[in-house]
From Swiss-Prot:
This is Recombination-associated protein RdgC. It comes from Vibrio vulnificus (strain CMCP6). It is found in: Cytoplasm, Nucleoid. InterPro entries: RdgC. May be involved in recombination. Pfam families: RdgC (PF04381). Belongs to the RdgC family. Keywords: Cytoplasm, DNA recombination. GO terms for molecular function: double-stranded DNA binding. The keyword Lipid metabolism does not apply. GO terms for cellular component: bacterial nucleoid; cytoplasm. One of its GO terms (biological process) is DNA recombination.
Length: 304
C-alpha cells in the first residue's frame, strides 16, 4: 500500500468526494475476471485486498481505492507466425495474393482462437484522494498509466475535473538552479543521483549515480547548456524520491523510522496494520506535497 510512485493531480473545480457514495459507484464497476474471449478487464477491487470487503478505505476524509487490470498475453510474434502460415496456405489454394481486408479478418480469427488459451497478467493501481489538499495521487510509473485509471474513475463517478499538478515555473529550471548553487529550500537535500539533458534538440543526456552533484564535473555540464531533468532528493529525513521535469515523483521511499512506528501492531492483525500504515502515509504526503510545490515556485490558479 505504501506508494512507490506519485503522479499528482489537482482538482480544478469544486467536487464532493463522499466515501459512502463512492463505495456504491465503485461497486457498479467492480473488477470481474476475463472471459474466454476478453482481451482485458479493468475494474475496482477492495482497497485492502483480501483483508477487507469495502471498495474504499477511509481515514478522516482521505480515501484510498484500488483498480485492477487483467490483460491476456498474446505475443505479436505468435500472431504473426500463425497469420503468415494461413496467408501462405490460402494464397496457394486460391492462386492469388490476399487483400488487406482479408488478412485483417484472418488476424482477428487467429486472435479469437488464441484468446482462450492465452496467459493473463494482472496489476493493481492505488489511487489516493486528498479532498482537503485538493489532490488526487496515483501510484503509477507514468502519466499514461495514471490517466487510464483516472479515466475509469471519471466513468465511475460521472465527472472528475482534475489536471496534472504542474508548477508555473519550469521544473527543470528550478532543479538546475538547486544543483548549480548547491542550495535547496529548507527541508530538502540533494542526494547523489541526477539526469541532465542538453537544451539542443540533438544534444546529449548525462545520467549519474553516486555522484557529488555540486562537483566541478556536473557544473561543467550545466555550463555547457545542459539542464537537470531528474533529481534525487531527501525531504526532512523522512522521504527520498526522484523528481522529474514533468513533476512526476518516482522511487518514493518512506524512512524506516516512519514505517517502524506501527511495529507494535501484531503482524497477524493485517487490517489494523494496513489502517495504521495508511494513516501514516497520508499524514506524510499531506505535509510533503504542499511543501514540495511551494519549493518549486507554486502551482497555477486552479482555473487558470
Amino acid at each position: 500500500m505504501w506508494f512507490k510512485n506519485c503522479m499528482v493531480y489537482r482538482v480544478n473545480r469544486e467536487i464532493e468526494f463522499n466515501a459512502d457514495q463512492l463505495e456504491k459507484q465503485l461497486a457498479e464497476f467492480r473488477y470481474t475476471p476475463c472471459g474466454s474471449q476478453d482481451k482485458q478487464k479493468f475494474g475496482w477491487v477492495s482497497a485492502m485486498g483480501r483483508h477487507g470487503d469495502m471498495m474504499t478505505h477511509v481515514s478522516e476524509d482521505r480515501i484510498l481505492i484500488c483498480a485492477k487490470k487483467e490483460e491476456k498475453m498474446l505475443p505479436a510474434s505468435v500472431i504473426k507466425e500463425s497469420l503468415n502460415a494461413k496467408v501462405e496456405a490460402m494464397e496457394a489454394q486460391e492462386g492469388r495474393p490476399l487483400k488487406k481486408k482479408e488478412k485483417e479478418t484472418l488476424k482477428e480469427e487467429i486472435i479469437i482462437d488464441l484468446l482462450p488459451r492465452a496467459f493473463s497478467r494482472s496489476n493493481h493501481t492505488y489511487v489516493l484522494i486528498l479532498p482537503k489538499e485538493g489532490f488526487i495521487l496515483v501510484d503509477a510509473s507514468s502519466y499514461k498509466k495514471a490517466e487510464d485509471v483516472l479515466a475509469l474513475l471519471r466513468k465511475t463517478m460521472g465527472s472528475l475535473p482534475v489536471v496534472p499538478a504542474i508548477p508555473e515555473k519550469a521544473v527543470e529550471t528550478t532543479l538546475t538552479e538547486w544543483v548549480k548553487t548547491g542550495q535547496t529550500p529548507q527541508g530538502f537535500h540533494l542526494l547523489d543521483e541526477a539526469e541532465l539533458k542538453s537544451v539542443l534538440e540533438d544534444g546529449g543526456i548525462i545520467r549519474c549515480k553516486k555522484q557529488e552533484l555540486t562537483s566541478d564535473e556536473i557544473l561543467s555540464h550545466i555550463a555547457a547548456d545542459k539542464v537537470v531533468t531528474k533529481l534525487a532528493l531527501n525531504w526532512q529525513e523522512r522521504l527520498e524520491f526522484v523528481l522529474a521535469d514533468d513533476a512526476s515523483i518516482k522511487r518514493l521511499k518512506f524512512s524506516d523510522e516512519l514505517r517502524d512506528q506501527n511495529d507494535d501492531i501484531p503482524r497477524e492483525d493485517q487490517a489494523a496494520r494496513f489502517d495504521a500504515d495508511f494513516s501514516l502515509m497520508c499524514g506524510e504526503l499531506s505535509a510533503f506535497l504542499p511543501n514540495l510545490f511551494q519549493a518549486l515556485g507554486g502551482l497555477p490558479h486552479p482555473n487558470a
